[in-house]
A protein has these predicted regions:
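Conserved non-catalytic scaffold segment of RNase H-like nuclease domains
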Residues: 2-120
Length: 120
């Protein structure tokens, strides 16, 4: 079994949940008023030594929603220019849909391999 094949130990370590590492950059700390500017998710699998290894990364620059607040202090920390022409940002819903679609695909793949190992 290679490192990209799911290890059944991951289910016991994470109580059946698939760990996904998520990082976001925002225009502030209030989810109701401040913009989501970047999101990234890293899918991981556990190797046979019990170490988590990245197997896929998905990242998007996100367009601030209409009326979103961009706190100057937050923008100074993250250094993001939301108007940069090479950002190629997508709407928040598109970015989140893409991330969730990949997570669901990964869950199905892990479940199928785990199910198949019972019969293998």
């Amino acid at each position: 079994m290679n490192e990209s094949t799911p290890n059944p130990l991951i289910a016991s370590r994470f109580r059946g949940f698939l760990p996904v590492i998520v990082d976001v950059e925002t225009g502030g700390i209030n989810a109701q008023t401040d913009a989501l500017l970047e999101i990234a998710a890293v899918m991981v699998r556990m190797d046979w030594q019990g170490y988590l290894r990245p197997v896929g990364t998905l990242a998007h620059h996100v367009q601030p929603f209409p009326g979103a607040r961009l706190d100057p202090a937050s923008m100074a920390v993250n250094g993001i220019d939301p108007d940069h022409p090479f950002r190629f940002a997508v709407p928040e819903s598109e970015a989140l849909d893409a991330i969730f679609r990949e997570v669901r695909r990964e869950i199905r793949e892990v479940a199928n391999v785990s199910w198949g190992q019972r019969w293998g």
